[in-house]
Amino acid sequence: MADEFSAGPDHRVGDHVAFTADVPHVYTRAQWNARPPRRPAKVLGRPPDHIVVHHTATANSSDRSLGHAFALSRSIQNFHMNGNGWDDTGQQLTISRGGIVMEGRNRSLKAVRAGDLAVGAQVLHHNGHTIGIENEGTYTNKRVPGRLWDSLVEVCVWLCQAYNLDPSQAIVGHRDYNSTACPGDVLYAQLPKLRRSVAARLNGSPSPGGVTGGQQMPAFPTFGDFG
């Protein structure tokens, strides 16, 4: 399709495109049928300095389909615009539990291509220097699905390359900036492994293994906890 954002080799898993190259296949807003934003996102002519990992704090769905992923993006946009009164989806990128990667905030993909930042609404007081990845699910005491984890690694590799970021410093969790349980204790505990996996890919080494379980904790945020 003409509006797909992809490069390098890819292969199909089920009804969506999976990726194994450093530039992932990202489904555009047009493909998941996004609403028009209230106004275009502000684009800064400079890169972000941090990649912020979130979780949606929604149900840990077993549906890995493309249709489910697109519905997820629409539900997030509706919640952010109707519930929070924001101009558009807060985060720049969204990954479903099936590992499907989608553009979130308008102008995000074009900005990444240019090495710029489309300012989102995903980290209170820190939106002007961060780019956010929303991961479907609640990871307070549940494992991260392998497909989601693999896509998260690939997306972080892509962003670190595009913005010349050091994963050991750049990849953080939402709770590192704001008072929140996001991205859940299990996913947050995996961030050191994520940094190592991304660094290994950037250095040309095989990515170390998949995700493992983590600690258990109670409270979790809602979509409105992005600030």
Regions found by a protein language model. Give the residues of each.
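Glycan-recognition patch characteristic of GH18 chitinases/ENGases
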Residues: G67-G83, D88
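Extended ligand-binding clefts on enzyme/binding-domain cores
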Residues: R64
